[in-house]
Amino acid sequence: MFERIISFAIQQRWLVLLAVFGMAGLGIFSYNRLPIDAVPDITNVQVQVNTSAPGYSPLETEQRVTYPIEVVMAGLPGLEQTRSLSRYGLSQVTVIFKDGTDVYFARQLVNQRIQEAKDNLPEGVVPAMGPISTGLGEIYLWTVEAEEGARKADGTAYTPTDLREIQDWVVRPQLRNVPGVTEINTIGGFNKQYLVAPSLERLASYGLTLTDVVNALNKNNDNVGAGYIERRGEQYLVRAPGQVASEDDIRNIIVGTAQGQPIRIRDIGDVEIGKELRTGAATENGKEVVLGTVFMLIGENSRAVSKAVDEKVASINRTMPEGVKIVTVYDRTRLVDKAIATVKKNLLEGAVLVIVILFLFLGNIRAALITATIIPLAMLFTFTGMVNYKISANLMSLGALDFGIIIDGAVVIVENCVRRLAHAQEHHGRPLTRSERFHEVFAAAKEARRPLIFGQLIIMIVYLPIFALTGVEGKMFHPMAFTVVLALLGAMILSVTFVPAAVALFIGERVAEKENRLMLWAKRRYEPLLEKSLANTAVVLTFAAVSIVLCVAIAARLGSEFIPNLNEGDIAIQALRIPGTSLSQSVEMQKTIETTLKAKFPEIERVFARTGTAEIASDPMPPNISDGYIMLKPEKDWPEPKKTHAELLSAIQEEAGKIPGNNYEFSQPIQLRFNELISGVRSDVAVKIFGDDNNVLSETAKKVSAVLQGIPGAQEVKVEQTTGLPMLTVKIDREKAARYGLNMSDVQDAVATGVGGRDSGTFFQGDRRFDIVVRLPEAVRGEVEALRRLPIPLPKGVDARTTFIPLSEVATLEMAPGPNQISRENGKRRIVISANVRGRDIGSFVPEAEAAIQSQVKIPAGYWMTWGGTFEQLQSATTRLQVVVPVALLLVFVLLFAMFNNIKDGLLVFTGIPFALTGGILALWIRGIPMSITAAVGFIALCGVAVLNGLVMLSFIRSLREEGHSLDSAVRVGALTRLRPVLMTALVASLGFVPMAIATGTGAEVQRPLATVVIGGILSSTALTLLVLPVLYRLAHRKDEDAEDTREPVTQTHQPDQGRQPA
């Protein structure tokens, strides 16, 4: 089949070139549509169910809201896991589905079960699904700020409430219409409310209750339609408006009467524009701000959506009131652009190095150009496939592309064509005719097709194990394997179509094969080394075996991690205070952190944070926790440009540690989300303890935490804050309440309305709407003694008058700590001890920590412990690769057997793999890089290249034997003749990765292990191919030589570069 393809390509060369140009045009079109990102989105298919349950304690929230929702979710098709969190007034259930489940189908299933659960939930508690986004969907954050001295139209300064109103009613509606945006979340400032604050004394003097005020507001704030009437042939719509239009309208609402006189709201309390009882706040550089967040629709491209949002923000800014502006504080595009710049730089530099090697070794400019053309053409082919399969260009998908490996097949064919054309011209003693030239090109391509096809297939097959990865690791590495295989496939197709056609067209009548100085130098050095190797077989093989054994020992000491942490250039800082810290106190403490860090470190551009829970509780936090971002300036603007990111982080940690009242957890914006998506925790590793009793869980967790803190490398060890939330409990005495004729709900309603407030209608202002809330004045709400005097209305007597008793008559007020939060996983309560690992690898940290915990902590009966975090993914990927990699290597051997039809020669080529691995292991050890899945991908790529080198040399030695050369002659001539292609293959493959190995840009740390492994492995593999493989071949075939009939000896004057030279 391939012979016909090659023949067609040469005969129809212009048609082939036209088709290649068409493919290139499609590739350019695809490149312009190619989604670009920093890393693949590894979010599992999950649906969040958020439920607001005002006034419910964590325990009540778990019992009455979380548990019923969890129960109905059980048994959903494709359900993989449920996680839940119950906090004061909030329940969040995360339903996780198996990979491949359509997210919209998953949401439909969850919504159906929510409808079932509603009957079992308390009245007024309504679950809602979270936005259709991913865990990495927070791509753009901004603040709405007023400049110093900015004034509103009435001359007053802008308040946090005013800024929140602008955010909610001007900015948010416009940004929600940007394509790719699924939701806008807001935190900070205050939701505007019209607050009715009755005086308890005035209410009691008029015999009125808080419920009377609520009812009066509800009955005097509505518009009613009354159909229509017809009059003199015209139709009139009848309506009776009664909606309040101003604060005065609210003040004039009648609540009741006293001695025939109306009692209005203004008579019993104040009406003012008030503030909500907020659950979250935002700060930036030490001052309160309003912070907005864009949630990207799942499946969209973060760079494209961020740019569209940024353009819309610029448009909105031009329409903002004077002195008010939107300031972008986080834009994912910045990270994406820096990461892609690193990838582009590495690929471009790698391509240049590869092309230089081609020019140096081929010695023919046109031949080198034809070979080099495969690089952009294969890339354009790859881009087309990536667009069709919706794979974004990112650090992972483009991180394993090596142009040297991609063009290996083309190098083999072009070199063979040049050699045959030169030899044919020398044989005829004249320039070749066109038909003779085409014949030689066909013969050369035909000779090379077998090692080319088998070599490329072998490299593709070694990538198959990566496709066996599942879950998070699968989502990270599948794109990488896909793009490499696609590029190799494109290069292979081009090698048997474009390359023969281009050689036939552009390599002219006069072809001279001449060796450059570099090759002559290499041969002069190689020939004596080869002779010494052949003369000292035992020494060479012993050295090779010892090298393998030593590297196996080194490999056991390398350590391991899932993937290297991407240096995002910014820092995430989470500040934790003791449970019960109020929101206002947390905000003040956070301001101190921000002002201190901003003043101490000129490298910091800004510090901003979210404290508590935002409007959409996608990431619920209690008021004692602040989730902060430290945005750094570009390194060129640092006062000390040589200062490393790690040194700056260490200095920031030290300075922050001096501020009292806070514990910290440091991470990076994407890394933090990455860890959280993996196992529901934000740290590198986590110990999860499961059981029933919260107190037992808490006590056990403290013991485990103490052990973890003693393990070298453990930092920021903390136990999930499950207890210690201060609670003021109104304990109602049923007997006393019954004596006064009161129901429990009568007392509860009075407390709930007075302290928590009650919505009593809506105030409309154009298309804006604000709640009207009845709540006691802050002076009363904040005083325990005042609450004890809260009037509780008694049932009306015969005179229809309302009488009151103080709350203290039927209830006591008790202050005691209660549960802070309750976490559950797969229907069971759990507590998490989290830790970040620095200065060592996770792979060695976890076994040491596990052994220490087992020896020092006794887990109670009925309770159990598991590990979470990135270690979980490392174990999963390692287990799967241990099964699949041997299968792939077996397939490689089967291909080698098919190539040679000889088990012995197949095994000889196969020995290239362990020698390649030794070089990769040694390179990692020298550079101090632990083993990771990224490094494992490098070893996988290495296996293909190592086998390809051996294939090139052994196939030629076999051909010489078939021509009648003696064993020693075939080995020597074959090794010297194939020195050039072996060195070219090794150099282009390794040099293509050199920029990746030494790069320092954003994302370089992710690619570095892979590149290091390939470079080190190719060096050792090349040494094997050039020195050990000839020794092994002669040793393996010595008996065959002895058994053969005596041949005519081949003279030593044979020149290795003459005669038939198949690839």
UniProtKB/Swiss-Prot annotation:
One of its GO terms (molecular function) is xenobiotic transmembrane transporter activity. The chain crosses the membrane at residues 14-29, 350-370, 452-472, 487-507, 534-554, 883-903, 906-926, 937-957, 982-1004, 1013-1033. Keywords: Cadmium resistance, Cell membrane, Cobalt, Membrane, Plasmid, Transmembrane, Transmembrane helix, Transport, Zinc. GO terms for cellular component: plasma membrane. Its main location: membrane. GO terms for biological process: response to cadmium ion. It is found in: Cell membrane. Pfam families: ACR_tran (PF00873). Residues 1049-1063 have a biased composition (Polar residues). Residues 1040-1063 are annotated as: Disordered. It is a multi-pass membrane protein. It comes from the Bacteria. InterPro entries: AcrB_DN_DC_subdom, Acrflvin-R, CusA-like. Belongs to the resistance-nodulation-cell division (RND) (TC 2.A.6) family. Has a low cation transport activity for cobalt, it is essential for the expression of cobalt, zinc, and cadmium resistance. CzcA and CzcB together would act in zinc efflux nearly as effectively as the complete CZC efflux system (CzcABC). This is Cation efflux system protein CzcA. It comes from Alcaligenes sp. (strain CT14). The gene is czcA.
